[in-house]
Amino acid sequence: MPTQSLGRAGEEATAQYLIERGCFVVEKNYRPAGRHEELDLIACDGRYLLFVEVKTRKQGTASAFCAQLAVTPAKQKRILLGAQKFLLDHSNYTCYQPRFDVACVTMLDNRVVQLDYYPNAFEAMGME
């Protein structure tokens, strides 16, 4: 499976995971105008506005073990900037508490074999 297709499959699996837990998906692959950041998923659970970074890997690869480590401080800062831009452009969501989550999806033969979800994986404090 090509890397982009693998990533999209992981994002779809994560969106379904969130929907099954009562969230609704606000945006997929949100890219603020004039910015380089892309937010994989934005969802809402009624209390929090979830900005979800999805990392998808093939089972059996070295990178599958440490997918969550791929969300570096630099990547966290880009996610934060994208989230700020989203909230500026969508004031109807400012009543929700933002939360930054990470989903690690492992796939084998075009199917999800594991989905680990880390709510509040990092915080905005100290990154501004």
Regions of interest found by a model, annotated:
Residues M1-Y30:
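Acidic-basic catalytic patches of nuclease active cores, encompassing PD-(D/E)XK
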Residues V26, V52, D101-A103:
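Hydrophobic/aromatic beta-strand patches that form the interior of the parallel beta-sheet core
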Residues V105-E128:
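Short, low-complexity, polybasic intrinsically disordered segments
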Residues E20, D45, Y93, T106, ...:
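Positively charged, solvent-exposed patches that mediate nucleic-acid binding
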